[in-house]
Amino acid sequence: ILTSRGGRTSHAALVARQFGKPAVVGASTITIDLTNRLMTIGSQTIHEGQWISIDGTTGVVYEGQLETMVPDIKDPLLIKLLSWADEFRTLGVWANADYPRDASRALEYGAQGIGLCRSEHMFFETDRLPHFQRMILTDYPVERKEALAALLPFQRQDFAGLFRVMKGRPVIIRLIDPPLHEFLPDLVELVSELADLKIRLKHATDMAAIDTLLAEIRQKEQLRKRAQILREANPMLGLRGVRLGIYIPELTTMQVRAIFEAACMVVKEGIDVHPEVMIPLTSHVNELVHQRSVLEAEAKAVMSEHGMEIVYKFGTMIELPRAALTADRIAEHAEFFSFGTNDLTQTTFGISRDDAETGFLIEYMESGILPANPFAMLDRDGVGALIDIAVKRGR
């Protein structure tokens, strides 16, 4: 993966690492022309279909196809070396995994659990996105429930796959986090597409073509209106995370049901399951109390339907300064904490990760204002101090 925007700690880079894909992110000297399917670097032009080779470790991109090799993670010498490290380490390593294939790769590398399954990534699949968009677009509770009911089997299947692969190891599933607008087409693109459709309609003469265009326009117009309503000045601090679960409680209910139906199903197959459900972006303890009541009621209902008891944990992600400072109150209702250091760093410094890494942050590091990129190296005095406070107060 090669991008002209973002940075090495941006979400795109994190996901690329999770997928095991070499990535060079934020190569600002390249210009990507999507219309003509090419990119330019200075006077050089690379067309779609030409080979380039990417070294995700050094950040170097080569023209042409270099000879490559797949690393052997089962090398006996490597396994021996890591076994020596295991004798002395005091920390365990859990992996990010959203799909069973990610979990399998993580186990091969020695992960002891799944520390973060981003449940929303599953909604972006082509067979699921229309149902999720339908849930967003409707104003009617019955239609929303129908859309969520259509999504339930997909989520259940994905969670069951993770539980099967992990075979009793802990799996932390984070409920939906991103703002809803991320699941809709870009507003500018929608306006452009609508303009194009209306021009085509103006020149259409065939009735069948006119009917098709009118249907497309109605659909796009509905998407545009909803995207306009959901548009926020600062979406990353808007309707997302725990706020979504409170705003649309049926969404939390569906996800919790999928988790526990999957757990019951896999336990019946003779496989031990240890789910841990995590609420994102908590800022006030009352948010957690609200979501815990919804979760416990649905989990109890599912376990009663299946005639079994699943041992699980309920926790939250500490990624806002207020959550860190009130961790003692939050800990009364959470069985574990996970620290979301990217959002915690953004909200502590008051800077946008993706914008800063290609802008002023470079100047800050080069001039010595900041000793290092705070998204790549933990800021011990600020963000680290908040984590320290949260741990001590939480305990």
Residue positions per predicted region:
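Short glycine-rich, flexible loops that bind phosphorylated cofactors or substrates
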Residues: 10, 61, 346
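Residue-level signal for inorganic ion chemistry
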Residues: 16, 52, 259
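Generic short alpha-helical hydrophobic face used as a protein-protein interaction/packing hotspot
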Residues: 17-20, 56, 263
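A structural-propensity feature for long, helix-poor, extended segments
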Residues: 29-63, 140-142, 147-149, 373-382
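Conserved alpha/beta-domain cores
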Residues: 58, 73-80, 84-395
